[in-house]
C-alpha cells in the first residue's frame, strides 16, 4: 500500500527524533529544520496525528526509550540512561519518568531486571 503523506512525515519525524534522542537540544525547531517544514507546521501536524504537543511528543519518546533501557540494559546506570535519552539533569529525568510511569527509574529498573 502507498503511504500517505502523513505517514511519510511521521516516519521522517520518528527518524529524526530517534537519531537525536541523546541530544538535549532536540526540540521543535531542530525537528522542523531536519524535516524541512516550518515549526508551526510540524507542531500542528503532530498535534493532529498524535494529540500531543511537539514537546510532549519528544518527551514521550525519550521516556519510552529510557524505560526500555532500564528494563533491558544491565550495564547502564540510571545517569547514563538519562544522558542517553537527552536529559542533562538527573532529578528532572526522575520526576518526568515518575510522572509517566508512576514510579522512579530505580523502582522501574528493579521491577524489570
What are the residue ranges of the model-derived segments?
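Short, Lys/Arg-enriched, Trp-marked, Pro/Gly-tolerant hinge/linker segments that flank
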Residues: 1-11, 33, 48-56, 60
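…primarily DNA-binding HTH/wHTH and HhH modules…
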Residues: 95-113
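Append "Primarily bacterial transcriptional regulators
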Residues: 29-37, 42, 46, 80-88, ...
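Inter-domain helical "communication" segments and dimerization helices
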Residues: 1-23, 110-113
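Basic, amphipathic alpha-helical hairpins
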Residues: 14-26, 46, 50, 68-76, ...
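Terminal helix-turn-helix DNA-binding modules in bacterial transcription factors
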Residues: 48-88, 110-113
Amino acid at each position: 500500500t502507498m503511504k500517505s503523506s502523513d505517514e511519510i512525515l511521521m516516519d521522517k519525524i520518528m527518524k529524526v527524533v530517534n537519531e537525536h534522542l541523546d541530544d538535549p537540544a532536540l526540540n521543535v525547531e531542530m525537528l522542523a529544520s531536519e524535516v524541512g517544514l516550518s515549526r508551526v507546521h510540524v507542531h500542528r501536524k503532530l498535534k493532529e496525528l498524535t494529540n500531543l504537543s511537539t514537546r510532549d511528543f519528544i518527551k514521550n519518546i525519550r521516556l519510552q526509550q529510557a524505560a526500555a533501557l532500564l528494563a533491558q540494559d544491565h550495564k547502564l546506570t540510571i545517569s547514563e540512561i538519562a544522558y542517553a535519552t537527552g536529559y542533562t539533569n538527573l532529578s528532572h529525568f526522575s520526576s518526568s519518568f515518575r510522572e509517566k510511569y508512576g514510579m522512579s527509574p530505580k523502582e522501574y529498573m528493579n521491577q524489570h531486571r
